[in-house]
């Protein structure tokens, strides 16, 4: 295993470099018959496309996806699905100047030692945030597969930038409002404060970190495995693959570590539709590495951009 493949039954292989000809992914294990087209991937790619505002990278890329295999007559065939994006806006000249001077906070030094200076350093190569586009392509398919087969839905949104934070409300409100602003925060007023904080830091030649919250609903109880293949283990591996992620918590997380057991426990109850639920969700929907039927709640901490 070289670190470029994620998953077991459904595997995602990421390839390409930031300033190479293209970046792409291969998703293997998707069953036949799922309605799928390039537009399904493009909708998600457009949400992360660079250059959309003054607070994102100013690199201009169209990020138009091309599906090369695995789709026929608008449906998956069960063959590996390969999709690529061509790189077009890559000025590598600044990287020639710094190639022998490791930048603080970047992977320059450890990658130079590991690969003996042969790694593609342009735009940070395989360590670039641009490679998240390959995850978005694979994630778009996985997301549709989960909705289509199990009616599982996942949303994510920003709850903190620097010292400015947002307390999440209902699932539906967060789902509806999260793309109404540049920082992807469901509350428009707090979003403006977050954006202003980013702009102020940028004026000072600096950057800010943040926290993203993710909620998955519709999962049945019992998904996952104990010990080394717990849901927390598998999800953490995937999420730590995103550049700049430095912290993850499930449910009450680090706050729960300050509570008593009686305060952190989630008592069971029978809901109005006769389902077993819990009164609270401090476990974040996972107990013993298995889903318990409650929403899975994850928070991911991102360090400030290094340059």
Kindly give the residue locations of the regions a language model identified.
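N-terminal, positively charged regions that mediate nucleic acid binding
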Residues: 1-59
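Glycine-rich, N-terminal phosphate-binding loop and its surrounding beta-alpha-beta segment
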Residues: 44-104, 108-110
